Regions:
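Alpha/propeptide regions of enzymes that mature by internal proteolysis
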Residues: 1-115, 174-211, 220-279
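Flexible glycine-rich active-site/ligand-binding loops centered on an Asp-His dyad
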Residues: 121-166, 264-279
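A short mid-domain helix/strand-loop element embedded in enzyme catalytic domains
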Residues: 164-174
């Protein structure tokens, strides 16, 4: 399986998971609002501190994004491109988003795919500080209590990454999901199956799904050989030996791809964030 050497030592825990109370939501985010503000107001209205969601429809404008790039120095295994700022309203096709906190303030980690005003399809890592809703966007997924995603410095990758952190204890009767982060160089399918099994879930639904893998090996599409990607999970069901992960990604050349991942051959590059609930 492919492997990318990270600049720092791997931590002892490769699957970080905390029990949560997950609340399903399906709501519309209003035109004119900052995406960051709208999402945190949604969470607050439901007594939550964030969550993992899929966004669809509507439009963004103005907004800004980056795509993967080669690292300029050995302090990271990969990095970000210069910032792109499309003109006009950009129609959102799909995005996966983790809503949490960075340095005590609201923050999100979001990978999306869209069609720009000139008809050009695009995708990448959307910047929280520069993303405004130009037409109402549908938000579906789960909000969480009992833990929240906090951006913390990660010694292995050199990045400040979202990781689930317990906020209030969740006992066996109140918890109905787990918030997770997967660390680098482990197969994404095997790790998700292990996370679900560790929580006692015979099968699980994946919510959100923001991260990166080392290129891609699809069951139904040509492979992606460039190692640096930004990925979202469009649909994920976790079952022992029968997990199905339907993803979309952009690589460091800007090439877009999508398909169902081949189990056992798609290692995590930097991270994967998600919430799992039993089915």
């Amino acid at each position: 399986m492919r492997h990318i050497q990270q600049p720092g030592p791997p931590g002892p825990t490769r699957i970080i998971a905390h029990p949560v109370r997950a609340q399903a939501v399906d709501e519309e985010l209003p035109r004119g609002a900052s995406l960051l503000t709208a999402l945190h107001e949604l969470a607050r209205a439901h007594g939550a501190e964030g969550g993992c969601l899929t966004l669809s429809g509507g439009a963004l404008g103005p907004f800004a994004y980056v795509i993967p790039a080669l690292a300029p120095d050995p302090s990271h295994a990969a990095y970000y491109s210069d910032t792109f700022r499309p003109t006009g309203a950009t129609r959102l096709d799909i995005a996966s988003i983790t809503v949490g906190f960075r340095d005590g303030a609201p923050f999100f980690h979001c990978h999306g795919f869209w069609t720009e005003a000139d008809g050009r399809p695009g995708g990448g890592h959307m910047l929280p500080e520069e993303t405004i809703i130009a037409a109402p966007i549908r938000a579906q997924g789960v909000l969480i209590a009992g833990a929240r995603f906090e951006a913390r410095q990660d010694a292995e990758t050199g990045f400040k990454l979202f990781t689930p952190v317990a906020t209030t204890p969740q006992n066996a009767t109140s918890a109905n999901g787990i918030a997770i982060r997967l660390c680098p160089n482990q197969d994404i399918t095997a790790a998700l199956e292990a996370a679900a099994a560790g929580a006692g879930f015979g099968a699980a639904r994946l919510h959100g799904g923001v991260g990166s893998i080392i290129g891609a090996r699809y069951a139904n599409a040509p492979p992606v050989d460039n190692f640096a990607t930004e990925m979202l999970i469009r649909d994920g069901v976790i079952r022992p030996g029968a997990t199905r992960l339907d993803v979309a990604m952009v690589d460091l050349t800007g090439q877009l791809s999508a398909g169902v991942l081949t189990p056992g051959n798609n290692p995590v590059l930097m991270t994967l964030e998600a919430v799992l609930t039993p089915v």
